[in-house]
């Protein structure tokens, strides 16, 4: 099951947040969350508002744990995720390879509901 929240300002979609519930019966208590906000709309509370709505929806669906992934260096994202109650639980070293050959780690965060 997938659910998307869109933020529209003056006819332009400026942000989106999605919730993807795990399909396997043993994992249906978990869901993955993804979020994006266009840079010129940062610091307006859009990400926080979408996350709050998504958490409300997840609880209504009986989801017990939310998960997300982020790439090292995403400091703005990390601040939002921590503000929303997520905590880092794992690192995937060298998970991302950039065009110049540089590797970045990917991190997993969870939040219990």
Regions found by a protein language model. Give the residues of each.
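Acetyl-CoA-dependent GNAT
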Residues: 1-40, 51-52, 112-113
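Short glycine/proline-centered loop/turn elements that form peptide/ligand docking sites
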Residues: 47, 51, 74-77, 94-99
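Conserved catalytic-core motifs of GNAT/GCN5-like acyltransferases
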Residues: 67-70, 82, 87-102
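Structural preference for long, well-ordered alpha-helical segments within the folded cores
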Residues: 49, 53, 57, 79-83
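Conserved GNAT acetyl-CoA-binding A-motif
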Residues: 51, 58-69
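Terminal substrate-recognition subdomain of acyl/acetyltransferases
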Residues: 103-113
């Amino acid at each position: 099951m997938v659910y998307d929240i869109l933020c529209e300002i003056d006819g332009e979609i400026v942000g989106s947040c999605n919730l993807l519930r795990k399909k396997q019966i043993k994992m249906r208590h978990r869901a993955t969350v993804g979020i994006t906000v266009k840079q010129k709309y940062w610091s307006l509370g859009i990400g926080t508002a979408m996350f709050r709505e998504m958490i409300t929806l997840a609880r209504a669906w009986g989801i017990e744990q939310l998960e997300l992934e982020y790439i090292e260096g995403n400091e703005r994202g990390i601040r939002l995720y921590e503000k929303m109650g997520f905590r880092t639980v794992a690192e995937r070293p060298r998970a991302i390879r950039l065009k110049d050959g540089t590797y970045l780690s990917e991190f997993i965060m969870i939040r219990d509901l």
